[in-house]
Amino acid sequence: PFALTLGARGSDVLHAGGPDRTGSAPITMDGKAVFRFAVDALPKCLHTVLDETQLTLDDLEWVVCHQANSRIIDHCVRALKADPAKFYKNMDRHGNTSAASIPVALNELAETGQLQPGQTIACIGFGGGLTWGGMIVEYKK
């Protein structure tokens, strides 16, 4: 649903060979399509990992989603009728840190003392190729 290309000063440095390109090649993404995908995938993924582990949302201390967009997480919280306090967000401080967003969030939770040994966390991500995945983690210091 979206294509990625590059066009900016220095873009020739990123060209790794192959046919010569001419013209502009800006990075583009169909944000609305990605949003629709994410707000559908995140709750499905969470339900899948909870079902597989025979847990419920109430069994989790934290849900750490890919930190792509605060509105995506807020939409999922509403769709799940969940407690927003369980859904960790740090985009206001770091923005979208791409593939590192879940590890960065987990580290931040641990370093600030909000993540305690024995707590159960769902990590739910989505990304390139419109893929998604999740896991349940029990934190051990």
What is each PLM-predicted segment?
Residues K44-E61, L109-Q114:
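Phosphate/pyrophosphate-binding loops at sites that engage ATP/ADP/AMP, CoA/4′-phosphopantetheine
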Residues V39, E61-K141:
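Claisen-condensing/thiolase-fold acyl-transfer catalytic domains that form or cleave C-C bonds
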Residues V13, F37, A41-V49, D59, ...:
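Non-catalytic alpha-helical scaffold/packing segments enriched in small hydrophobic residues
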Residues P1-D40, K44, F126, E138-K141:
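Condensing-enzyme catalytic core mediating Claisen C-C bond formation in acyl metabolism
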Residues D30-K32, L57-D59, N90-M91:
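A short, structure-level motif marking secondary-structure boundaries and short turns
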Residues S24-P26, D51-Q54, D83-A85:
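A short alpha-helix capping/helix-coil boundary motif
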